[in-house]
Amino acid sequence: MVVTAPVLPTLKTRTAPLSTLLSLTNFSTSGVMSAMSPKPSSSTSISLIIILPPYEVKLRTFIVYNSRLHVVPVEGLDEAVRTNFPRNLDYCGKKLRWWAEGVDERGPFIYFEVGLCHVVNVKSATLRSSPLNNIRCENLKAPPRQKLGYRSKSPYSHLHDLTSVVFCYVVGNLQHEQFLYLRGAIKFCADGDNQGLHAQGL
């Protein structure tokens, strides 16, 4: 299945190769193997909604949603997403739409889309107190939503305060092409101690 969608102006093609994504994002492999543990930590307080951008990038190996890290073997992804992954996730009143699913030469894949398809200018973000505690990224600058085809008066209308930002991550084992390109929303812990997620440069 081929899904076409608008791309950010910084990319010249509809399908962004992995090398392009890596050139746009700082990537550290530290902590990746521990992130693939089949038993996620019960104390991990990640509030992270999975979002794949409008590039043809495949979901591999594991998925993150609803405050838990879920490991999904590539060979079992097709069945797992049908039985365990909700088709309509809810985040701040916004529904994540099941975008597409299919199988290519490397195995099954899925896409997701939501209204938060847009990156704010944050210098860096770090996941800590979680299996992904050593993964860092540099965020991309994005034009206002209007230039991306969104119907919104304010390009940052979804940001109610500084406890919610939009970010990009590339995580996974690149040697085996098991990777996940995430776009989602960081939501700090309700108790205010930032134990689950921490953002710098705000």
Swiss-Prot record:
Organism: Archaeoglobus fulgidus (strain ATCC 49558 / DSM 4304 / JCM 9628 / NBRC 100126 / VC-16)
Domain of life: Archaea
Listed name of the protein: Putative uncharacterized protein AF_0740
